[in-house]
Regions:
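Active-site-proximal, substrate-binding regions of enzyme catalytic domains
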Residues: 2, 8-291, 301-331
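Short, hydrophobic beta-strand segments that form beta-sheet elements in well-ordered domains
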Residues: 293-297
């Protein structure tokens, strides 16, 4: 089977022109067509989270289409699986926790599980009865997403400015400096630190704040712990770079665009990139669970420019995908 992954905008395009009362039949028809072509819809909680963001306020301009996108995707998956089980693709934090630290973040697993449960409830409900949209920490989905997006926009600008500064110091071109190991480690730290903090808050990893510099002359134990921490982070970051090249390439492409715009690219535009980059963790070794995939997007040009996809057949604009899906021939 070939996995089909929608990014958030493609998920909205997926239900464009479909009425609320037509969603169930539409989803059943799409599931049948997917099956006939050997396709399997894979739903990311990252996309569900972005769509739920627009359901917090019924006056949101994307309220209706986001509801329809969630309902249609969940129903397609349900019709395809026929076992009542909704598969959840692991977001970046869970992948890093499991594959790099060999641990589980139960708190984050629970949060994503709750989001997928809400999506499942929505798939059998109606648009006038939206369930409570709070995350595990008590904040709304909107608050959580806003915080992540704002932090990312600030962080990626800082990385870009650091690359620009270092290129002046070293005499290297911007592109050469962007591709140094030091820059790649800086980029990856954005994700690895998030996961470390999650595991730290669950008591599974030590609180690094307790052994940060400066050190006194008799601080041998704190120094030893600090060296252990930095070694753990360095090894983990290098392993993330090795295992997940697609996310790193897209991250770099966004940095290039900031640089080329003279840092004039808007904050609103930057914020949305964090979710696109997060989705790239799903395409580890250019498969999904060792099965082929097609990534359906509204920004194919950028993904191809980044080099995240070695095979251009693995990424399609939604229009291309829809046109092919409605044909009877093979891909």
């Amino acid at each position: 089977m070939t996995n089909i992954i929608f990014d958030t905008n493609a998920a909205r395009d997926f239900v464009a022109g479909v009425g609320l009362g037509e969603l169930e039949q539409y989803a059943e028809n799409i599931a049948s067509r997917f099956n006939s072509k050997g396709l399997k819809l894979s739903v990311s909680p990252v996309v569900i989270q972005e769509l739920l963001y627009h359901l917090v306020d019924s006056n949101d301009k994307d309220f209706s289409v986001s509801f329809k996108a969630i309902k249609a995707m969940m129903l397609v998956q349900e019709y395809q699986r026929k076992d009542g089980v909704h598969a959840m693709m692991s977001p970046s934090e869970l992948l890093i926790a499991n594959e790099i630290y060999h641990m589980r973040s139960e708190s984050r697993e629970l949060m994503y599980s709750q989001l997928m449960t809400i999506a499942m409830v929505l798939s059998h409900g109606d648009i006038n009865h939206i369930p409570d949209l709070h995350t595990i920490d008590g904040g709304t989905v909107k608050t959580y997403v806003d915080d992540i997006e704002s932090g990312f926009a600030t962080q990626i600008r800082e990385v870009c400015q650091s690359v620009e500064f270092m290129s002046k110091i070293t005499g290297k071109s911007f592109e050469e400096e962007l591709n140094t190991e030091a820059t790649e480690i800086s980029i990856v730290t954005y994700f690895s630190r998030t996961t470390y903090n999650l595991l730290m808050n669950e008591g599974k990893l030590p609180d690094y704040h307790l052994f940060q510099p400066p050190f006194l002359s008799d601080d041998d134990e704190r120094l030893r712990k600090y060296m252990w921490f930095t070694d753990l982070m360095m090894k983990g970051n290098k392993e993330i770079i090795r295992r997940y090249p697609a996310f790193l390439k897209l991250f770099k492409e966004v940095i290039r665009r900031i640089h080329k715009s003279n840092n004039q690219i808007s904050g609103e535009r930057l914020k949305n990139y964090v979710w696109d980059i997060s989705l790239m963790f799903h395409v580890n070794d250019h498969t999904v669970n060792h099965e082929p995939f097609r990534f359906i997007t509204t920004d194919k040009a950028m993904l191809l420019a980044s080099g995240a996809f070695r095979n251009s057949n693995n990424v399609m604009n939604y229009g291309e995908f829809h046109e092919w899906l409605m044909q009877n021939d093979e891909l």
